[in-house]
Amino acid sequence: MSICYYDTVGREKRLLIINQRALALPNRTISSDGTCCDGDEYLLVDTFTKLNFKVQTIRNASKIVLETTVRNYIEKNVKRVACYFVVVLNDGNDADTILTTDGTYSLSELYALFTLYTVRAIPKVFLIQSCLGAKIDRSHCDRASCQCDQEEDAHPTSVCHDIFVNTVRRVIHACSRKSNGSTTTTETKCSDVATVVLTSPHTEETIIVYLRIEAYLRYGDTKCGCFMIEKFCKNLIKYGTRSSVHTTITMVQNEMQITDPKHVPIVQMNCTKLLFLGDENHIIMEEY
């Protein structure tokens, strides 16, 4: 394995899906099977299972259940872990919080759980899909058990990128810890709205992919899920076993820019290596 890649061969790859979407529905109505037409969750489980991930899902949790689950996910047999993936499916909340049955849980608190010394060097990928709005787009829903109203209306509009600035600051503050007294400061352009100064140690090894959509609680097709999750899973299968996850994310941004330019996810990377999910003998990227 090249020194340019994290050592993941023979180690356990983990995915945690935090699905709080039903909590944002009117009167919290959900389908009779409790899944609330969530193609995203189905697609994520199927995709990551094919990539030999150990998949865990938590739905509609309280704050204490959410935090306890995440802690156990992080700390169990940590020496065997190759990488952590966390997908948050979360609607109807403020930009920097996760809706729970008893209030909200901040994303900063979630990220801070991964600052333990024992997991700092392990690559961590967070995929945050969040929507905020009164309308529910069920135009593609084909689940007979769904009790949600369908509204076919204008295309949803994404929130202005400046909403993310304070969120990113809090995220980086939570994840930033001095490592041997040394930190690196960089400036990253957050769209064309503002410049955020990011201070983070070399050892955090974190990727955050964040997309927020306003106007709709948007789930999309029950088989495909929302656009970002669908494209992420498709490209992860296509590129994740042949090159790096970084390439996968770039391809998602590329496709979103072409097909849905208002909803290109914001990506924050703080990595010293590339994350590769396939057999080391199949790496086709150029060695440095």
Swiss-Prot record:
Q: Which SUPFAM superfamilies match?
A: Caspase-like
**Which family does the similarity line name?**
Belongs to the peptidase C14A family.
Cleaved signal peptide residues: none
In the UniProt entry, which residues are flagged as the active site?
131
Q: Enumerate the GO terms in the molecular function aspect.
A: cysteine-type endopeptidase activity
InterPro entries for this protein: Caspase-like_dom_sf, Pept_C14_caspase, Pept_C14_p20, Pept_C14A
The GO biological-process annotations, alphabetized, read as: proteolysis
- What Pfam families would the database entry show? Peptidase_C14 (PF00656)
Q: What does this protein do?
A: May induce host cell apoptosis and contribute of the establishment of a special cell cleavage process in which apoppotic bodies are rescued by the virus and differentiate to form large vesicles in which virion assembles.
Record's protein name: Executioner caspase
Q: What induces it?
A: Synthesized 9 hours after infection of cells ex vivo.
The EC class name is: hydrolase
Q: Does the keyword Protein biosynthesis apply?
A: no
- Per the UniProt entry, the Enzyme Commission number(s) are 3.4.22.-
